UniProtKB/Swiss-Prot annotation:
Pfam families: WDR55
Presence of keyword Repeat: yes
Protein species of origin: Drosophila pseudoobscura pseudoobscura
The protein, known as: WD repeat-containing protein 55 homolog
Ranges for region Disordered: 1-131, 483-503
First and last residues of every WD repeat: 157-196, 201-242, 244-282, 285-324, 327-366, 411-450
Keyword Nucleotide-binding set for record: no
Length: 503
């Protein structure tokens, strides 16, 4: 509190007598003057608009009133001044407080009526209404996309590296093999995926996982040189082929409910029967890793590709070599059967696709340039369409005989490790080095017509074209929408103009 030197608290009657009335009145007037100055300084922050809102008089108006008061002839300097009393000062303070309270409440009522932004709030609301009208179609499109049902299951993400995936032949179950030797069984669906169980099968990396044709057993091959057969109903081990190979097993192929074949890193191929302990036969015709094995519906021939560039064919019934191809200066990584089992197509590490007539596997009859990046995986989608994938992270569809790039089915951020398709041929699953499994609905390939040899095509655009299952869109789709909109506007203008009345 600010103190004044002229104002003293009397301690006795003598000091009280020393205080005259003029001194007391002067001190009171000084305190009142400072209070008024403080109020003026606090009110100086209010701008002219706030003064108008509080119905305060304008500065010029105050000046005029002061002049009129000073020029009033009725003013008597000798008249008794009632302002010297304390009671009159209190009444003036109460009157000022009441007037300021009324002004504040009036301003508060005006602010409540105008909203937080006053008159600007109305213009802002108007702009938002215009914005809503302009973006109405975009909002509707976003809502429709959110409400649109999924056409494929969501992504599955694991902590461990996924080495292989395999669909169950009868149920909506997919098996995921991992680098730590475990197998995860998931029940998949468009609404979500559910982990059914995790089976610890191998002490080292599980490189391949397959179901038997009847779906009763799960077969796994591992780097620990073992093959394990697990009963899915009881989750118990049915059979263990310990040290099935002298080297790490890389590939496993199921022929039927009893027969299966295995291939290791040293090029040895063995054929097994679940009803026996020992292999039916064993052949070693190459010196490098077996990359894939396959057979047709007749199951008379077993074909194997290897990393040293050979396509080797075994006669199952005779248990001997049928034919071996000429060596290629590139790795043969994958293969598929097409055209009613009349064509075999092999993918290589240089991105090429070699075509063979069935039964004549000594040398290819045709060669396609492919995608110019290593083709590590191949899955037949239809009798004439294949999906290939590799290190670039893209899954591409191509037409076989004649060869055409159809476009991109799906994408991963890292190289793709495995591919598989379900029994109905509608759902494709892929895993990548990012420890994820993605699903792609490829049912639209059923509507693809056959391609003729003399059909005109643009190879550059076909290689980069995104198919319906892809998560990316084509730049041409944006302009096609604009063209469609222009055509609709033109039709509306023609309809509004009406038919021409010619004389």
């Amino acid at each position: 509190m600010h103190t004044h030197n002229n104002f003293k608290t009397p301690s006795d009657a003598d000091e009280l007598d020393d205080l005259d009335d003029d001194m007391v009145i002067g001190v009171i007037e000084e305190i009142a003057q400072e209070a008024l100055v403080g109020e003026d300084e606090s009110d100086s922050d209010i701008d002219e608009h706030d003064l108008a809102d509080m119905e305060a008089p304008e500065p010029n108006q105050n000046a005029d009133e002061n002049e009129s008061i000073s020029s009033d002839s009725s003013f008597d300097p000798n008249a008794e001044d009632s302002s010297d009393s304390d009671d009159s000062m209190l009444e003036e303070d109460e009157a000022e407080g009441a007037s300021s309270g009324e002004a504040t409440s009036a301003k508060r009522r005006k602010d409540d009526n105008d909203g937080p932004c006053g008159s600007a709030g109305d213009s802002a609301a108007f702009d938002l209404d215009d914005l809503d009208d302009e973006t109405d179609e975009t909002v509707r499109a976003i809502i429709a996309a959110i409400k649109k049902p999924r056409s494929a299951p969501p992504e599955i993400k694991l902590e461990d590296f996924i080495t292989d995936v395999c669909f169950h032949p009868d149920r909506d179950i997919i098996a995921l093999a991992t680098i730590i030797g475990d197998v995860h069984l998931y029940e998949y669906g468009n609404e979500g995926n559910k982990l059914l169980r995790t089976i610890e099968v191998h002490s080292k990396a599980c490189r391949d996982v397959e179901f038997t044709e009847d779906g009763r057993y799960l077969l796994t091959a591992s780097k620990d040189k073992c093959v394990m057969v697990t009963d899915l109903e009881t989750e118990k081990l049915k059979k263990l082929y310990e040290t099935a190979h002298d080297d790490a097993i890389n590939k496993l192929h199921v022929l039927d409910e009893n027969l299966f074949a295995t291939g290791d890193d040293a090029g040895t191929v063995k054929l097994w029967d679940l009803r026996t302990k020992n292999p039916i036969f064993e052949l070693k015709e190459v010196e490098d890793q077996i990359t894939q094995m396959i057979t047709n519906d007749q199951k008379k021939l077993l074909l194997a590709t290897s990393a040293d560039g050979y396509l080797t064919t075994f006669n199952i019934a005779a248990r001997k070599l049928y034919v071996q191809s000429e060596p290629y200066e590139e790795e043969l990584n994958c293969m598929g059967i097409y055209r009613g089992s009349s064509k075999l197509v092999v993918g290589t590490s240089k991105g090429k696709l070699y075509s063979y007539n069935w039964g004549y596997f000594g040398y290819h009859c045709d060669m396609y340039p492919g995608i110019k990046s290593p083709v590590s995986l191949m899955i037949p989608i239809t009798d004439r369409i294949a999906c290939v994938a590799g290190e670039d992270g893209n899954i591409r569809a191509c037409h076989i005989t004649p060869y055409r790039n159809l476009g991109v089915v799906g994408q991963h951020n890292m190289p793709i490790e495995s591919l598989d398709i379900n029994t109905s041929g509608e759902l494709l699953a892929s895993s990548s080095h990012n420890n994820d499994v993605r699903f792609w609905n490829v049912k639209y390939f059923e509507d693809f017509g056959d391609i003729k040899y003399n059909d005109k095509h643009n190879a550059y655009k076909e290689k980069r074209h995104n198919l319906p299952s892809s998560k990316c869109t084509n730049a041409s789709d944006f302009f096609s929408d604009l063209t469609k909109e222009d055509e609709d506007n033109a039709d509306n203008n023609d309809a509004a103009a009406g038919p021409s009345n010619s004389a």
